[in-house]
């Protein structure tokens, strides 16, 4: 109860962070004359800690202004305080200024169609603050109002506030608790007074870019009527906005820009921003495509790369490939950017800029958006802020009523969870759009935080060009039909100002249409790529059978083992962790056999020794969910951390392990993006339990399993999914192996179930050393991490290799074997122990360690000597409708002799992955083991 009262008090208190600016202005009045503030505020300020009598408190704004003037001019100014005779209404003036900062956006002219019916905001009226018409001619101190003056008449203050906060830009930033950030925005927003200044050349550029945006859509509509293109029309300003963002980024020193967006306006961006040849796009509309391999994807999912000339040099652009699943590309872009920043050593995030482009319904509706915002400042996922642009066309397919699409005032309110400033802007005002674009990027670069631009526009056609929007939005589309295009409106504005003429505007239209007819690049800033940002050439054209060197010199391996077991003497470990590290030293010396954790650590150490980068993330990945990894050592005295794998030697590759935010979808998407931009190293995502990975099913289905076939995108991401039936119930038993196997085709990925420490060692090394990059899905163990039989020798690591299938290990007489049991994973040890207990000699057990691509030759070799076999059995712990049985039995049948019988031993089909009662689990487990080992 106490916590609830305290929370309520803080939220309503004047000490709440959102009121900081207002309180500071009141305090400055109090310093000039305590009687100018109310008795309540006077008591608050009187109660502040007193300064020594020889110290005089000065208003903060005066001090800031003083030093600002010193920096700009040679002569000095004395600090002066306000006139003590200022009228008490001064407080009301400051309240009015604050009201506009907080709520002016609610009265801004944001909707190009003028259809928004928003209630009046009483606080924006001077009369609400008891300011009369007579007061309008009075002069008041403006406080922190960054208008360039200390005092102004109230009428001038009021008019300025209207222009700044209620024009084409609606600024939301007072929810930010950091006063420095709010002051920074005010000092750049308020002096402009709603009228940004641009040169004649810049204005012509904006008109040219609006002409291009409109011209392409009209050209496509005429040339390919009825074809889906998800037109940008109505949101044309996105093209000049994005190009201005890139130009400003280049001038700021950026070297790369990575863009993620959905289908709306994508074709326009490809042609008019990234420089895709119009003829190539026309060929796609006509059904032509290259003779490459792969199934391909629709044109509005395609990515693209190019270089773009800016005042600061060429900037490399990359538009990410993406599916129609809205918003999922955003964490992919962040992962790609993080990889590029790591590769460039861009520690201050000043060289690579992420831009994500959203829809208004999607940013409010898709849960991955909140996950992505939550990652934005987390250590393992921060990219120094993302510029997030919302193409707010006020309708999602057929739904336009905000009460149906969200529960908030704006679609962008979700961004307030990370205190991102939000700039709403009317897309029919391209100069306001350009101003907000620069302001947003400058904020991102200054504070390295996310910033949102809400580009309020409309959709001239239906969801696609074959759709009829009047059926569901009749009033909106009656208005749109009569509404001039953004190009026409801006051309008229420039003509009225005398900065352009009708002939010039028409000439731009004709020149752009002629350029489209020629089919060549229409972006004047386009440059051929000097070099690929990410070099994939070493990994192209290789199949699964390319040889790789699994050997590692024993002496070097032992040396690495000793190094990764060292930590400073002053670093006090938990007793259990200390025992694990002592045991690992014994494993290196040969006194003990290697367990899973040590073999895994040695695999990482060898890759780091070769200069490869390793990145591991997941919930609890530093320690490991099951207390086996301990890559991060925590000092029990001061909570400091030490990572032995980062301290092997000076020339090693970088090693990073992050305990991720508690998200599967956004984090896995981030790691996919990272792996697609960092092919040379190891990128590994680990689920806390494999059961929870289906929270990221969109990433698995749309990117990991199919990205190569759809888009030709290689990816070497590794997924560790703890899997195994140990009586822990339906939520902690199954990584849903069957779903990954169902997705396997066309050699698209690997599904592996390693059963020994040596296997996991070679599996990890193979993923990096072998010059082929495809996803690796691993059913990793839980109880096997400490199983007494699940051990390997140093010899197995140094001179062994990964075995896709492992034959019988006991000395059985092949002629006596009547049954061969195939299996994968933990169940092997249950079968082995029970067979030994039974002293059976007639059943051989073969482990299939790699279920896809299926190792047909290796399995056939493992059973070749068993010529008297009566039947073959596939044994699994999972229910019959799950696991590998349904998805892989055709492979098992192909491996055994023609006409041989293949039986199933496992749990019966079940709607749930596992039972919830330990007693039932044990009964089922015993039955399936007996079934597998008992001959008919």
Name every feature range the model reports, one short phrase each.
Residues 2, 7-48:
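Subset of Sec-pathway N-terminal targeting signals
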Residues 194-216, 283-345, 644, 771-837:
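Active-site cores of enzymes that catalyze phosphoryl transfer or operate on phosphate-rich substrates
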Residues 255-419, 423, 626-678:
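Cofactor-binding active-site loop characterized by glycine-rich and histidine/acidic residues
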Residues 100-103, 107-160, 168, 277, ...:
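Glycine/aspartate-rich loop-and-adjacent alpha/beta segment that forms the canonical ThDP
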Residues 48-238, 254:
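Extended, charge-enriched "interface" segments that sit outside catalytic cores
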Residues 486-487, 497, 501-614:
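Hard-cation-handling environments
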Residues 95-112, 244-273, 358-377, 448, ...:
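Conserved phosphate/anionic-ligand binding catalytic regions in large, soluble enzymes, centered on
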Residues 2-7, 16, 46, 119, ...:
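Thiamine diphosphate
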């Amino acid at each position: 109860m106490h916590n609830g009262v305290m929370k309520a008090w803080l939220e309503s208190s004047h000490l709440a962070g959102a009121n900081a600016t207002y309180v500071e202005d009141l305090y400055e009045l109090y310093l000039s004359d305590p009687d100018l503030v109310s008795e309540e505020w006077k008591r608050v300020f009187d109660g502040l800690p007193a300064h020594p009598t020889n110290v005089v408190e000065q208003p903060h704004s005066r001090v800031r202004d003083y030093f600002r003037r010193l920096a700009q001019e040679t002569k000095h100014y004395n600090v002066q305080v306000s006139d003590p005779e200022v009228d008490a209404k001064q407080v009301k003036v400051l309240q009015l200024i604050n009201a506009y900062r907080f709520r002016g956006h609610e009265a801004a002219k944001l909707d190009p169609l003028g259809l928004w019916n928003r209630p009046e905001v009483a606080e924006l009226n001077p009369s609400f603050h008891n300011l009369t018409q007579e007061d309008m001619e009075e002069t008041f101190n403006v406080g922190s109002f960054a208008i360039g003056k200390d005092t102004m008449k109230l009428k001038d203050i009021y008019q300025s506030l209207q222009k700044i906060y209620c024009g084409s830009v609606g600024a939301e930033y007072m929810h930010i608790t950091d006063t420095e950030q709010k002051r920074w925005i005010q000092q750049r927003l308020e002096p402009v007074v709603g009228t940004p200044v641009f040169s004649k050349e810049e204005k012509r550029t904006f008109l040219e870019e609006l002409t291009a945006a409109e011209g392409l859509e009209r050209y496509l509509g005429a040339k390919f009527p009825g074809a889906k293109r998800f037109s940008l029309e109505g949101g044309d300003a996105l093209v000049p906005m994005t190009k201005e963002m890139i130009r400003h980024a280049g001038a700021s020193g950026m070297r790369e820009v990575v863009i993620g967006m959905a289908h709306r306006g994508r074709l326009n961006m490809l042609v008019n921003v990234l420089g895709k040849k119009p003829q190539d796009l026309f060929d796609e509309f006509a059904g032509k495509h290259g003779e490459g391999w792969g199934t391909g994807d629709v044109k509005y999912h395609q990515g693209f790369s190019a270089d773009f000339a800016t005042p600061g040099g060429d900037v490399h652009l990359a538009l990410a490939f993406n599916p129609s699943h809205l918003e999922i590309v955003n964490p992919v872009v962040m992962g790609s950017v993080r990889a590029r920043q790591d590769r460039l050593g861009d520690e201050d995030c000043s060289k690579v800029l992420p831009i994500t482009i959203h829809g208004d319904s999607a940013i409010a509706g898709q849960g991955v958006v909140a996950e992505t915002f939550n990652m934005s400042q987390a250590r393992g996922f921060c990219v120094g802020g993302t510029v997030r642009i919302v193409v707010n066309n006020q309708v999602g397919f057929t739904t336009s009523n905000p009460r149906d699409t969200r529960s908030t005032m704006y679609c962008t309110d979700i961004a307030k969870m990370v205190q991102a400033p939000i700039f709403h802007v009317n897309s029919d005002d391209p100069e306001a759009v350009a101003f907000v674009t620069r302001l947003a990027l400058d904020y991102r670069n200054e504070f390295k935080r996310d910033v949102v631009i809400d580009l309020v526009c409309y959709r001239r056609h239906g969801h696609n060009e074959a759709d009829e929007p009047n059926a569901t939005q009749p009033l909106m589309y009656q208005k749109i039909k009569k509404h001039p295009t953004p190009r026409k409106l801006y051309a008229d504005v420039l003509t009225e100002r005398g900065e352009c003429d009708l002939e010039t505007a028409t000439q731009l239209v004709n020149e752009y249409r002629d350029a489209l007819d020629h089919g060549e690049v229409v972006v004047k800033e386009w440059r051929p790529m000097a070099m690929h940002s990410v070099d994939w050439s070493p990994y192209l054209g290789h199949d699964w059978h390319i040889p790789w060197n699994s050997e590692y010199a024993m002496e070097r391996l032992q040396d690495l083992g000793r190094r990764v077991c060292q930590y400073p003497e002053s670093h006090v470990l938990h007793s259990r962790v200390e025992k694990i590290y002592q045991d690992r030293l014994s494993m290196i010396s040969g006194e003990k056999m290697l367990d899973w954790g040590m073999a895994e650590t040695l695999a990482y150490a060898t890759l780091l020794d070769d200069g490869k980068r390793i990145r591991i993330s997941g919930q609890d990945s530093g320690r490991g969910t099951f207390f086996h990894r301990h890559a991060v050592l925590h000092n029990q005295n001061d909570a400091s951390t030490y990572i032995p794998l980062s301290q092997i030697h000076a020339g090693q590759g970088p090693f990073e392990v992050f305990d991720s935010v508690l998200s599967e979808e956004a984090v896995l998407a981030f790691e996919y993006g990272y792996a697609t931009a960092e092919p040379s190293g190891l990128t590994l995502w680990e689920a806390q339990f494999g059961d929870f990975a289906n929270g990221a099913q969109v990433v698995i289905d749309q990117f990991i399993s199919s990205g190569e076939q759809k888009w030709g995108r290689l990816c070497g991401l590794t997924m560790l999914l703890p899997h195994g039936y140990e009586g822990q119930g339906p939520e902690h038993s199954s990584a849903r192996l069957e779903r990954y196997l169902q997705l396997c085709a066309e050699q698209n990925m690997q599904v592996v179930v390693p059963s020994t420490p040596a296997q996991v060692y070679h599996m990890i090394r193979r993923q990096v050393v072998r010059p082929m990059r495809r996803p690796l899905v691993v059913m990793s163990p839980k109880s096997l991490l400490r199983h007494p039989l699940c051990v390997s020798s140093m010899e197995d690591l140094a001179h062994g290799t990964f075995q896709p299938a492992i034959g019988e290990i006991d000395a059985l007489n092949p002629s006596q074997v009547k049954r061969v049991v195939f299996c994968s994973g933990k169940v092997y040890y249950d079968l082995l122990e029970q067979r030994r207990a039974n002293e059976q000699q007639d059943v051989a057990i073969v482990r299939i360690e790699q279920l896809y691509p299926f190792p047909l030759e290796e399995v056939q070799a493992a059973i070749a000597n068993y010529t008297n076999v009566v039947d073959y059995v596939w044994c699994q712990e999972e229910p019959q409708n799950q696991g590998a049985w349904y998805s892989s039995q055709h492979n098992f049948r192909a491996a055994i002799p023609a006409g041989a019988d293949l039986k199933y031993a496992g749990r019966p089909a079940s709607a749930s992955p596992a039972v919830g009662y330990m007693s039932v689990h044990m009964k089922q487990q015993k039955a399936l083991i007996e079934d597998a080992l008992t001959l008919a």
